[in-house]
């Protein structure tokens, strides 16, 4: 455990922010730097079958130290950080023995406040690692990376019985490409866990069904003084489209198992406009209904337009709720829950209001629920992680390996 914090601070010092709209994978050079560093560290640790694919997926194996019919299991984290907020020149602050109240982030006016983030009340006495208010931290998911690497070191250096352990580090998870080039067969695990969750105890096996909706609107621009009966304002059509989308089904008005429509971006002129929505829902039927709703809205608003003016809508599914795949293998969750209880942690089963690589991998034949990392407030300047939470995550990973070995002996 002594190197856990050291590893984490080293990893977050590297700018691995991914970039959307880029064809190449990984989308940024910084991710390669961390992947090559991890490859070197895995080699120094003595793991075998270490491969780094041309698409930036790093895999390695810790051989079993006991005999028996023990299934190979995996642990997976992603190396990129979110494009939503700067990940360059991350300058972590370490707050030991947190005593409550506001935490100043750097030398400006930014603070991490329990008024805005009440979870801080539960973390008194712990060591918090925060940002300096200028960048994100990168605990999503470098906390997971550091925890997996530390768990490997623990298993390697202690006589803890375990079967074959597979590990993988993926790029571009934050832009939805992390699992697209993942070779499940080459990985060779019967099941796996992503280490990409939040607070201590979180065990997630349900995530959104997700789709993107791109709308292109072509209008007709003429001089406003002679526009009557001729002008078709693409921006007005965009406004009408958004007015038809249920206002009470947006991210800012929903929680728990509630789905939403989210207008992520909009740009344009009188002549042309573009809108980008994302659709999310846990229920597959409701998910399909939301997609139909968007098509109906576009058809309604576009009715009666001049033939040269039109509304074009393209919907693409991004990923699906992994619940239907994971529940087919209940022992995967049973082992994780038992591991947490053995580490004096109360498992907290909650839905992911988002997605993970594990969602896609579960549909590729690798059931893959999500474990906590001990981090909070991802993708922004208020992101932080607790050292105690990270240590708990390492303990759970090690215990999962041990319990899996006992099942097979």
UniProtKB/Swiss-Prot annotation:
Catalytic activity: Release of the N-terminal residue from a tripeptide
Single GO molecular function: tripeptide aminopeptidase activity
Ranges in a coiled coil: none
Disulfide bridge positions per record: none
Record-listed Zn(2+) 1 binding positions: 78, 140, 196
Domain of life: Bacteria
UniProt xrefs under InterPro entries: ArgE/DapE_CS, Bact_exopeptidase_dim_dom, Peptidase_M20, Peptidase_M20_dimer, Peptidase_M20B
Enzyme class, broadest EC rank: hydrolase
Compartments, record wording: Cytoplasm
NCBIfam families, per the entry: peptidase-T (TIGR01882), PRK05469.1 (NF003976), PRK13381.1 (NF009920)
PANTHER family reported in the protein's UniProt record: PEPTIDASE T
Protein name: Peptidase T
Organism for this UniProt entry: Salmonella gallinarum (strain 287/91 / NCTC 13346)
Taxonomic classification: Bacteria, Pseudomonadati, Pseudomonadota, Gammaproteobacteria, Enterobacterales
The encoding gene: pepT
């Amino acid at each position: 455990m002594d190197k856990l914090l050291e590893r984490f601070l080293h990893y977050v010092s590297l700018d691995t922010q991914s970039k959307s709209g880029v064809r190449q994978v990984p989308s940024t050079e910084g991710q390669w730097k961390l992947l090559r560093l991890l490859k070197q560290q895995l080699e120094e640790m003595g793991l075998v079958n270490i491969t780094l694919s041309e698409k930036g997926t790093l895999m390695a194996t810790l051989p079993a130290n006991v005999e028996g019919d023990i299934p190979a299991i995996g642990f997976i984290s992603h190396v990129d950080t979110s494009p939503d907020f700067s990940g360059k020149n991350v300058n972590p602050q370490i707050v030991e023995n947190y005593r409550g109240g506001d935490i100043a982030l750097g030398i400006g006016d930014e603070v991490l406040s329990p008024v805005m983030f009440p979870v801080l009340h539960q973390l008194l006495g712990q060591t918090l690692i925060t940002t300096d208010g200028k960048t994100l931290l990168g605990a999503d998911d470098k906390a997971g990376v550091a925890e997996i690497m530390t768990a490997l070191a623990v298993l390697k250096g202690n006589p803890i019985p375990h079967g074959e352990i597979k590990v993988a580090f993926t790029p571009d998870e934050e832009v939805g490409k992390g699992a697209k080039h993942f070779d499940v067969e080459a990985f060779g695990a019967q099941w796996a866990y992503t280490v990409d969750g939040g607070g201590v105890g979180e065990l997630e096996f349900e995530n959104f069904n997700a789709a993107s909706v791109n709308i292109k609107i072509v209008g007709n621009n003429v001089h406003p003084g002679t526009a009557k009966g001729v002008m078709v304002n693409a921006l007005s059509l965009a406004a009408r489209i958004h007015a038809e989308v249920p206002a009470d089904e947006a991210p800012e008005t929903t929680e728990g198992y509630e789905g939403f429509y989210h207008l992520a971006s909009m740009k344009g002129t009188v002549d042309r406009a573009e809108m980008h929505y994302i659709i999310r829902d846990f229920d597959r039927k409701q998910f399909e209904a939301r997609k139909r709703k968007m098509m109906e809205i576009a058809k309604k608003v576009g009715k009666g337009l001049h033939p040269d003016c039109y509304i074009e809508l393209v919907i693409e599914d991004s990923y699906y709720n992994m619940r239907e795949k994971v529940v087919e293998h209940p022992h995967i969750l049973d082992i994780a829950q038992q591991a947490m209880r053995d580490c004096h942690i109360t498992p907290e089963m909650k839905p992911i209001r988002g997605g993970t690589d594990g969602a896609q991998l579960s549909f590729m034949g690798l059931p893959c629920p999500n474990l906590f990392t001990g981090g909070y407030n991802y993708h922004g300047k208020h992101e932080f992680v607790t050292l105690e939470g990270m240590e708990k995550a390492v303990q759970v990973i090690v215990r999962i390996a041990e319990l899996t070995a006992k099942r097979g002996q």
